[in-house]
């Protein structure tokens, strides 16, 4: 089923060229079904790229989805034109009285900083607090997952000895979890980070389930038992060339990074990487929308005001 978006959003041209099903507002309004309302808090500097990546995956789900974008007003974007932000993004003050079936909190290139030193940290914690009564299920990605665990459960991130970058094998630890419906026993996906959270901290400080993990990546996917909190430390949404662009960016600024693992054929950066995680990515996002959101969210989203006991950090 399609996603419904502003007709002027630049990502639409890319998505239509890939034969992604986009529905205009006239057609959407004639369907006798309540669309899912999803808010994307986009913390990535390359906003338009991340928009396209996430919308591509949401468009593969079997439901009509209305998508809105949120940005942190306390942070000035250096890589996205102000006109784009003003046209397609909303501030927290503009959405704080609304309700959503799902919230996606993206990663951000700030993981080597203490959380409290991130310039929009206080505003982000307001969003986390607000989501208790205004969002049914929240999907936290990469740094967004670490930020959510830190604020909601007191689980801090731990530095790795070197950057984890590449395509890594992960094992499904809970095949009975709805998020893993349709997955094989193992899958691969991109990871790109300098920090991690430990299994010991998750066991000692939360009652979250470890849904997937890997020998090289450690914890990969965590979830609350009712799927209203979902944490993914990888990057299912990454394009074929995203890690390549990150690698070349790091080279240009003199970081001298290792070649991303299991990515370039023959570890040769001049070769085009193989796309090996697309099916797992589509399955994961479809499962989140269907099982964590659609099957359980109230028809009247205002009812979320009356039922927020699922958050263990209240």
From Swiss-Prot:
Annotated Gene Ontology cellular component terms = cytoplasm
Q: Which UniProt keywords apply?
A: Acyltransferase, Amino-acid biosynthesis, Cytoplasm, Methionine biosynthesis, Transferase
Report the domain of life of the source organism: Bacteria
Q: Which gene encodes it?
A: metAA
What's a Gene Ontology MF term here? homoserine O-succinyltransferase activity
What name does UniProt use for this protein?
Answer: Homoserine O-acetyltransferase
Specify the species: Streptococcus thermophilus (strain ATCC BAA-491 / LMD-9)
Pathway recorded for this protein: Amino-acid biosynthesis; L-methionine biosynthesis via de novo pathway; O-acetyl-L-homoserine from L-homoserine: step 1/1
From which residue to which does the signal peptide run?
none
Q: Which family does it belong to?
A: Belongs to the MetA family.
Question: Do you know which Pfam families this protein is assigned to?
Answer: HTS (PF04204)
Tell me, what is an example of a GO biological process annotation in this record?
L-methionine biosynthetic process from homoserine via O-succinyl-L-homoserine and cystathionine
Which residue numbers mark the site Important for substrate specificity? Answer: 192
Entry-linked InterPro entries: Class_I_gatase-like, HST_MetA, MetA_family
Residues flagged as site, Important for acyl-CoA specificity:
111
- Chain sites annotated for binding substrate: 163, 192, 249
Q: Enzyme group, top EC level?
A: transferase
Which Enzyme Commission number(s) are on file for it?
Answer: 2.3.1.31
| Reaction(s) this enzyme catalyzes, per UniProt | L-homoserine + acetyl-CoA = O-acetyl-L-homoserine + CoA
Keyword check for Amino-acid biosynthesis, yes or no. yes
Provide the protein's localization: Cytoplasm
Q: Does the keyword Amino-acid biosynthesis apply?
A: yes
Catalytic residues of the enzyme: 142, 235, 237
The role this protein plays is: Transfers an acetyl group from acetyl-CoA to L-homoserine, forming acetyl-L-homoserine.
């Amino acid at each position: 089923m399609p996603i419904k978006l502003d007709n002027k959003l630049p990502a639409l041209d890319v998505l239509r060229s890939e034969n992604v099903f986009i529905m205009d507002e006239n057609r959407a309004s004639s369907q006798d079904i309540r669309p899912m309302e999803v808010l994307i808090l986009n913390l990535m500097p390359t906003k338009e790229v991340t928009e396209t990546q996430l919308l591509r995956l949401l468009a593969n789900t079997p439901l009509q989805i209305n998508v809105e974008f949120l940005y942190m007003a306390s942070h000035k974007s250096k890589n996205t034109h102000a006109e784009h932000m003003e046209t397609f993004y909303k501030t927290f003050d503009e959405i704080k009285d609304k309700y959503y079936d799902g919230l996606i909190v993206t990663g951000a290139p700030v993981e080597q900083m203490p959380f409290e030193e991130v310039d929009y940290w206080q505003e982000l914690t307001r969003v986390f607090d607000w989501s208790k009564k205004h969002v049914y299920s929240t999907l936290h990605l990469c740094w967004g997952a670490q930020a959510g665990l830190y604020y909601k459960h007191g689980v801090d991130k731990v530095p790795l000895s070197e950057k984890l970058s590449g395509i890594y094998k992960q094992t499904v630890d809970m095949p009975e979890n709805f998020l893993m419906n349709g997955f094989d026993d193992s899958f691969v996906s991109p990871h790109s980070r300098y920090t991690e959270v430990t299994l010991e901290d998750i066991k000692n400080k939360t009652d979250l389930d470890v849904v997937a993990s890997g020998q090289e990546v450690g914890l990969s996917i965590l979830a609350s038992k009712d799927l209203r909190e979902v944490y993914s430390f990888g990057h299912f949404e990454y394009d074929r060339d995203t890690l390549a662009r990150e690698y070349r960016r790091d080279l240009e600024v003199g970081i001298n990074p290792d070649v991303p693992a299991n990515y370039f054929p023959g570890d040769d950066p001049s070769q085009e990487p193989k796309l090996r995680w697309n099916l797992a990515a589509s399955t994961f996002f479809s499962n989140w929308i269907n099982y964590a959101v659609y099957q359980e969210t109230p028809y009247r989203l205002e009812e979320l005001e009356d039922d927020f006991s699922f958050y263990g950090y209240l």
